[in-house]
A protein has these predicted regions:
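Fungal secretory targeting signals
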Residues: 1-18
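Glycan-recognition and catalytic cores of secretory/periplasmic carbohydrate-active enzymes
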Residues: 20-367
Length: 367
């Protein structure tokens, strides 16, 4: 569950960029200097960015040092954009040139990943480029960053299969041809495709992204708002072959992080593609996520909502969901729903932040 600890920390300043909620912004402002101290220690532990083959932090364990990964690594490289994304968000929060310079230094080496479609999950391109170059362009307006985002969009568009109506995800066995895997995580990784369609890329990309989202709704979102992690199709006929999980407890269970990806991803899809069905799905997924926490009398999810007994909690899923709920509050349509989603986000984030802080103290975190 620590593999995404960096996301949980990054999502705290991310809330500042995503929401107009003054209560959350006040909380973030109070804690900002503490966050800066943690990330400064991370930078110090990593040293300067090497000219070639830089390694990016993705996990911190009991040893008190960061575990790092190459961006091209199949198992962990998909996380490599999160750290520069975190640096860009700190620049946004402080306008410190030191954070900007660090963000630029850690972002630039990732440019080649925009075309890395030979990954075990080629949609990871969206994770890597969206969080790093996406924030870089948003905060600087530098067209060099925009060009990389659109290169990622082009790569994702090349993975689209019109017969299935989706962008291909996993490429490892048993998901090799004739199988065609679509995963719930993909709702978070199609940002370059969605955004690029109206920002210098091909206009057809919007249709690809919208059809993909509808395919996910039909085949990965259950009627009660819970989600499968993966749906497998026949790449030639488009027929659905199976629904299940890889990272979750069982094929019929709900992997908490996947549920969080869906929540955030469908809000993002609604914001960029303006399809009411995506908002409805985001609300259904959010209601299921929060409902499970309320039923369990807690505001931090287990790694899988259906795993039996006492299970490890997943603060990364909590942080992703909290961010998604704040985004959802901005498009909810009524003041009552806005308040409800913000309250849910605040409850989740407050409990998760406390859990993360305790973990940092107990394990002498490398932060």
């Amino acid at each position: 569950m620590q593999r995404l600890a960096l996301i949980a920390l990054a999502s705290i300043p991310c809330l500042m960029s995503e929401a107009d909620a003054s209560t959350l912004q006040d909380t973030i402002a109070t804690d900002l200097s503490f966050i800066e101290q943690l990330v400064t220690k991370t930078l110090d532990s990593l040293g300067s960015v090497p000219a070639a083959n830089p390694l990016y932090p993705y996990a911190g364990g009991d040893s008190g040092t960061w575990t790092t990964t190459s961006p091209s690594d199949g198992a962990h490289g998909w996380t490599s954009g999160f750290f520069p994304g975190e640096l860009w968000l700190l620049y946004q929060a402080t306008r410190s040139t030191a954070w900007r310079d660090a963000a630029q230094a850690w972002t630039t080496p990732l440019a080649s990943q925009a075309s890395s479609v030979d990954r075990i999950d080629p949609t990871d391109i969206g994770f890597i480029i969206g969080t790093s170059f996406g924030n870089a362009y948003r905060l600087t307006g530098d067209t060099a960053y925009k060009n990389v985002i659109n290169a990622a969009g082009k790569s994702l568009a090349g993975l689209y299969n019109p017969t299935v109506g989706a962008v291909r995800s996993w490429t490892f066995s048993p998901y090799v041809p004739p199988n065609f895997a679509v995963i719930i995580d993909s709702m978070m990784t199609l940002g370059p495709l969605q955004w690029g369609a109206s920002n210098g890329g091909m206009s057809t990309w919007a249709g690809y992204a919208a059809t993909h989202a509808q395919t996910v709704i039909t085949n990965l979102v259950r009627p009660n708002g819970s989600t499968f992690e993966v749906a497998v199709f026949d790449r030639t006929t488009g027929a659905l072959k199976s629904q299940g999980t890889f990272a979750g407890y069982s094929d019929s269970s709900t992997w908490a992080r996947g549920q969080a990806w869906a929540l955030y991803g469908f809000v993002q899809a609604y914001q960029t593609l303006d399809n009411p069905a995506f908002l409805t799905t985001a609300e259904d997924v959010a209601n299921y996520f929060v409902g499970q926490l309320v039923a369990d009398h807690t505001w931090i999810p287990p790694w899988d909502f259906d795993a039996p007994g006492t299970q490890p909690v997943d603060t990364s899923a909590a942080a992703i969901a909290a961010d998604g709920l704040v985004m959802l509050s901005t498009v909810a349509g009524t003041s009552a729903l806005e308040t409800m989603y913000l309250d849910d986000a605040e409850n989740i984030l407050g409990r998760s932040a406390a859990t993360i802080l305790i973990t940092l103290i107990r394990k002498a975190s490398p932060c």
